[in-house]
Swiss-Prot record:
PANTHER family: UPF0060 MEMBRANE PROTEIN YNFA
Source superkingdom: Bacteria
Pfam families in the cross-refs: UPF0060
GO CC entries: plasma membrane
Membrane topology qualifier: Multi-pass membrane protein
Compartments in which it is found: Cell inner membrane
Similarity comment: Belongs to the UPF0060 family.
Species for this entry: Janthinobacterium sp. (strain Marseille) (Minibacterium massiliensis)
TM regions (residue ranges): 7-27, 31-51, 63-83, 87-107
Annotated keywords: Cell inner membrane, Cell membrane, Membrane, Transmembrane, Transmembrane helix
Protein name: UPF0060 membrane protein mma_0129
Source organism phylogeny: Bacteria, Pseudomonadati, Pseudomonadota, Betaproteobacteria, Burkholderiales
Amino acid sequence: MFEIKTVALFVLTAIAEIVGCYLPYLWLRQGASIWLLVPAALALGIFVWLLSLHPEAAGRVYAAYGGAYVAVALAWLWVVDGIKPTNWDFVGVAVTLAGMGIILFAPRA
């Protein structure tokens, strides 16, 4: 159960970070309203708060979180941007998720 909660927390954290970065991108690159910076700042604040909820040491959390971030970013590419990932993208996600699993589930001394 701990692992499921941890992975779910990683996914929520990644979504908050991606939203917090995507909204300014829309403003800067696609001419969207500057008011998107308000929800972007809120999303990044939520991102930082969610990072603080992770039970492990910060360095380990950031390392393991990277795997979830890559997976969520690829899903974002497909769902939001409408670009289907390549087979190599999926291989890369599998490798990063394997690394995340090793970091999360390795025995601790």
